[in-house]
Every structure is written in structure tokens, then in C-alpha cells.
Swiss-Prot record:
The gene is Camkk2. InterPro entries: Kinase-like_dom_sf (IPR011009), Prot_kinase_dom (IPR000719), Protein_kinase_ATP_BS (IPR017441), Ser/Thr_kinase_AS (IPR008271). Residues 124-139 have a biased composition (Low complexity). Expressed in all tissues tested. A differential expression pattern compared to CAMKK1 is observed in the brain. The autoinhibitory domain overlaps with the calmodulin binding region and may be involved in intrasteric autoinhibition. The RP domain (arginine/proline-rich) is involved in the recognition of CAMKI and CAMK4 as substrates. Activated by Ca(2+)/calmodulin. Binding of calmodulin may relieve intrasteric autoinhibition. Autophosphorylation does not alter activity or regulation by Ca(2+)/calmodulin. In part, activity is independent on Ca(2+)/calmodulin. Residues 165-446 form the Protein kinase domain. This is Calcium/calmodulin-dependent protein kinase kinase 2.
């Protein structure tokens, strides 16, 4: 059985091959891609088939946007897959094994970036959307999340265009795939795009999970867990749409085409990655741990105020922004609740960060807020010691240690007694006596004995609600690529008819049963089932229509049927092309 936690430090890893970013080059002052350039030579490429976890970026890997802009373009006509086709180009798995649900990540750090005291790469300054600004306030009204239900994917010469977004480098890799750097041409801003394959989610839904207890029913005021992976994704979107806090990652846009397999979630770019890797030989100092933990407290207090339980708090889900503050990410297993607390009975999340009451054999109902407090305690322990408090190579032994083993502190590094007291109270195995968030905010270690008080709940939290009308008004309808090509062709041919209609009908007629020996029509638009006399009655008096069936007229210079119609007599009204008969559907 795969191990849950490894006590060995993460080994050096080989950088994965750039799969898409090499096609993102552009000249200075130009956008990465010229939209709809050369539509006649467009090709559509779609190779995404991954469930992306935004927070699973390579820790310490900065996104060098200058390199992303200056990479050489691909050759014309070369396919641009979103995942490397060569298995040897993928990075090997590292020694870190956080859980059965979380594989190791790989990726290089840019050598041109500077390093902070933790060795984490710091990227150059870049433009951000107002939502990602450090000055954003949770008390400001949030702009409704844009939902696009029509997705146009264009394979151009040097990039892959997804609506207004140009997909570039791979900036992270999670349990189900990759995260792509996305450039928005409308606001000249970089974002992180999370891609989900609905088919793959359904295939992977068979991963072994603990069955619900017999006769279990959701408690009043509690949560009802979604039944399938697709429902979990849409629950994550519903939760993220209503959140607006400096310490919570923001969902900017959702691109969803009901007729296609993929769903795209566009997030603000948190460019410095997770706060730390676990396990590590370089834990944080107490001052650094306090700084990040204060951000975590404010973010969790805000989530609980919005009646949301995160259920997967851990260092890899805490991303460091350009301003140095952390943002909570990955709401894939979150729960919304009614009342004062969530009443839960199922087991989800990362095993090493699960609370003992969630691992009980009796499957009793337990508090959702207490689960987040336990995970916060494990995270704080990781901050200062670089490892989890309970570790084992076997999942069942790990569960046993979490439920019964006493908490121990290593001799090194030596930490303050106040910090030991806080961790001990957060990792209380009894959820009823476990410390709660309001008490954590006032703890002497958190506030430096009152020198650094945290804001009150009223200052930190504002209830955010998005009405259905606001969501409907935020939906953006974008024509598909086929529609754009059709309009382009109609304009080029100066025709108001569908230039592809004839070929489609001919193919359908030849494929219909009983029509294999039917004589080919003399005009491309002629339906096989309409008699010749009916066609003649439908035509207006005048010269006989040419072979293109009235696709143009002499009034349009260069039209496809100029030779068939000729010029009208002087002084006579202009002739109109014959009416095109209505399409008759052939049996299939």
C-alpha cells in the first residue's frame, strides 16, 4: 500500500518539459496572439483531460513571465498539446508522499529570480486584476463571477487561444493534472487556469472511499455531501463565487460549454506558490510562522462566517501572493452549512491532516469547525518543525496514531512555551474541549501578548451574497469558432447564404438509406426529395438559375454566380436570385 507520509526530505526533481509555453512568444508591444488571425488556416486542438488542483504548484517555483513572453514560436501547423505526449519528458515522482490523494510535484525555479530567506523564488512584478490587489477589502462589494457557456478554442501559429485567454506555460501540477498560465488579452493580466475533464472525473469516481453508515441521514442544519465528482466541482464553483477576502483565492471566471467535456476555472495568479513543502529540513522561524498563521486565522474566520468549512487546510493549500500574504485555496471538498456549525459524518481531505473524530469507526456526527481547527494545528506544527505530528507509512497505522498517540514535540528547534500551548490545545483529540477560532485570535502567542491584535470579526468579515440576477447578467455569450469561420467565409464570398450548406446536404443525402443509387442533383442545394416541377414553380420568372442555385447576383461584383445571372437590362429592376427551397431532412 502506498505510504501516507514520508519523513525524508524532498529530493531534487527534474523539470518537466515545457508543453505549451514555448508557443507563447510575441514581439515587444504585441499581444501574445493576434485574435482570429488567418481563420482559413485555423486548426482546433484540445488535449486537456485533467482535473487540475490549483494549489498543487511546485513550492518555491516562481513564474518567470518574461521567459513566457520571449519563448520562440512553434512552427506553422504544429500541434500544440496541453500535455506532453512523451512520457520520458515528465518529471519523476519525488520522495514526498503527503497522502494517498496527493502525488509529488515537480518543476524548476527560475535562476533569474531572487530568493527570500526561505529560499522561495520571488517573481518580478506583474500586473494584477483589481481582485488580486493587496489593497482589496472584504467589505467592498464583489463583482459577480463571469460565466461563459460558449467556449471557442483556437489553435494558432504560436499559441492556443481559449476565448480571450492565451494558454502558456505549465505553472503547477496537482492530483489530476496541470495548471496553465493564462494571459487575458482584454485586461493584459495573467491568471491561473484550472482545467477539469468531466469524463475523467466520472472515471476516477471509483476511487475507494469509506461507505456511509447504514441508515445515516443528514442531521438538521448540517451538510449534504454531493454524490458525484461533477457535483463536487460545481459545489466548489458555487462556494468560490461568493468569496471575497484578501486571504482567500478569488475565482475570476468560469468557462463552461455544456456540449463539450471540459470546464475551465480562471483564478487570480498567486505567483509564489505554496507557503512550504512538507516534509522539509528548513522549517519556518516562529516570527514567519506567526505572520502566516495570522493570515490563516483571518481567512478561516471569514470562511466560517460565510458558513463554509474548508476541510483540507494544509501548507500546500496556502499560497503566497506577491504581497507576501497567504491565500487559502482548493475548495474541492468544502462544505456549506446552515445554522451555527456544520454537522458532518463523512471522511474527506488529506489523511495526515484529518481530525481523530472523523476517523472513528462508529461514524458519529461531528463538528465541521472543529475539523478546520485541528487541520490548522497540524499546519502550524508543520510550519515550525517541517513535518506532521503523526506519521506512518501505512494508512491504517496513521489513523491509529492520530486517534490514540500522544502529541510530542521534537527537541529541535526549540520553540516558545506559548506556541506549544497553542498547538496542544488545537490538537486536542476531544473536539468538544478543542480551542475555537475566537480563542485562537486572542492567544498570547498569536498576538505577541497583545502587541499585534487581530481585527475583530466585524472588521474582518462581511457577508457576501450574489443574487441570481447578478449571476445571469454576468454570463457572457461568445460565438463558437465554427460560427466565426462561417461569418468570415460569407463576408469573403460576399454571399448571404451558407457556403457550406451544399456540401453538408450532399454528404447527408449520400449517407441516407435508399439513396446510394440516386442521381446526384444538378444544383448543390437541391434536396433529393423535391420533384423538379416543384422546384420550377418555386423559381421566379426570368433567366434560368446557374449551377450555384442563386448563391449570388450581378449586383455583387465578384459574387459566385455572376456568370449565371449576367447584368440586368438598362432601366429594369434588379433581378433577385431564386429562392432557396427549405431543407428537407433525409432519413438517417
Amino acid at each position: 500500500m502506498s505510504s501516507c507520509v514520508s519523513s525524508q526530505p524532498t529530493s531534487d526533481r527534474v523539470a518537466p518539459q515545457d508543453e505549451l509555453g514555448s508557443g507563447g512568444g510575441s514581439r515587444e508591444g504585441q499581444k501574445p496572439c493576434e485574435a482570429l488571425r488567418g481563420l482559413s488556416s485555423l486548426s482546433i486542438h484540445l488535449g486537456m483531460e485533467s482535473f487540475i488542483v490549483v494549489t498543487e504548484c511546485e513550492p518555491g517555483r516562481g513564474v518567470d513571465l518574461n521567459l513566457a513572453r520571449d519563448q520562440p514560436p512553434e512552427a506553422d501547423g504544429q500541434e500544440l498539446p496541453l500535455e506532453a505526449s512523451d512520457p520520458e519528458s515528465r518529471s519523476p515522482l519525488s520522495g514526498r508522499k503527503m497522502s494517498l490523494q496527493e502525488p509529488s510535484q515537480g518543476g524548476p525555479a527560475s535562476s533569474s529570480n531572487s530568493l527570500d530567506m526561505n529560499g522561495r523564488c520571488i517573481c518580478p512584478s506583474l500586473s494584477y486584476s483589481p481582485a488580486s490587489s493587496p489593497q482589496s477589502s472584504p467589505r467592498m462589494p464583489r463583482r459577480p463571477t463571469v460565466e461563459s457557456h460558449h467556449v471557442s478554442i483556437t489553435g494558432l501559429q504560436d499559441c492556443v487561444q481559449l476565448n480571450q485567454y492565451t494558454l502558456k506555460d505549465e505553472i503547477g501540477k496537482g492530483s489530476y493534472g496541470v495548471v496553465k498560465l493564462a494571459y487575458n488579452e482584454n485586461d493584459n493580466t495573467y491568471y491561473a487556469m484550472k482545467v477539469l475533464s468531466k469524463k475523467k472525473l466520472i472515471r476516477q469516481a471509483g476511487f475507494p472511499r469509506r461507505p456511509p453508515p447504514r441508515g445515516a441521514r443528514p442531521a438538521p442544519g448540517g451538510c449534504i455531501q454531493p454524490r458525484g465528482p461533477i457535483e463536487q466541482v460545481y459545489q466548489e464553483i458555487a462556494i468560490l463565487k461568493k468569496l471575497d477576502h484578501p486571504n482567500v483565492v478569488k475565482l475570476v471566471e468560469v468557462l463552461d460549454d455544456p456540449n463539450e467535456d471540459h470546464l475551465y476555472m480562471v483564478f487570480e495568479l498567486v505567483n509564489q506558490g505554496p507557503v512550504m513543502e512538507v516534509p522539509t529540513l528548513k522549517p519556518l522561524s516562529e516570527d514567519q510562522a506567526r505572520f502566516y498563521f495570522q493570515d490563516l486565522i483571518k481567512g478561516i474566520e471569514y470562511l466560517h462566517y460565510q458558513k463554509i468549512i474548508h476541510r483540507d487546510i494544509k501548507p500546500s493549500n496556502l499560497l503566497v501572493g506577491e504581497d507576501g500574504h497567504i491565500k487559502i485555496a482548493d475548495f474541492g471538498v468544502s462544505n456549506e452549512f446552515k445554522g451555527s456549525d456544520a454537522l458532518l459524518s463523512n471522511t474527506v481531505g488529506t489523511p495526515a491532516f484529518m481530525a481523530p473524530e472523523s476517523l472513528s469507526e462508529t461514524r458519529k456526527i461531528f463538528s465541521g469547525k472543529a475539523l478546520d481547527v485541528w487541520a490548522m494545528g497540524v499546519t502550524l506544527y508543520c510550519f515550525v518543525f517541517g513535518q506532521c505530528p503523526f506519521m506512518d507509512e501505512r494508512i491504517m497505522c496513521l489513523h491509529s496514531k492520530i486517534k490514540s498517540q500522544a502529541l510530542e514535540f521534537p527537541d529541535q528547534p526549540d520553540i516558545a512555551e506559548d506556541l506549544k500551548d497553542l498547538i496542544t490545545r488545537m490538537l486536542d483529540k476531544n473536539p468538544e474541549s478543542r480551542i475555537v477560532v475566537p480563542e485562537i485570535k486572542l492567544h498570547p502567542w498569536v498576538t505577541r501578548h497583545g502587541a499585534e491584535p487581530l481585527p475583530s470579526e466585524d472588521e474582518n468579515c462581511t457577508l457576501v451574497e450574489v443574487t441570481e440576477e447578478e449571476v445571469e447578467n454576468s454570463v457572457k455569450h461568445i460565438p463558437s469558432l465554427a460560427t466565426v469561420i462561417l461569418v468570415k467565409t460569407m463576408i469573403r464570398k460576399r454571399s448571404f447564404g451558407n457556403p457550406f450548406e451544399g456540401s453538408r446536404r450532399e454528404e447527408r443525402s449520400l449517407s441516407a438509406p435508399g439513396n446510394l443509387l440516386t442521381k446526384k442533383p444538378t444544383r448543390e442545394w437541391e434536396p433529393l426529395s423535391e420533384p423538379k416541377e416543384a422546384r420550377q414553380r418555386r423559381q421566379p420568372p426570368g433567366p434560368r438559375a446557374g449551377p450555384c442555385g442563386g448563391g449570388g447576383s450581378a449586383l455583387v461584383k465578384g459574387g459566385p454566380c455572376v456568370e449565371s445571372w449576367g447584368a440586368p437590362a438598362p432601366g429594369s429592376p434588379p433581378r433577385m436570385p431564386p429562392l432557396q427551397p427549405e431543407e428537407v431532412m433525409e432519413p438517417e
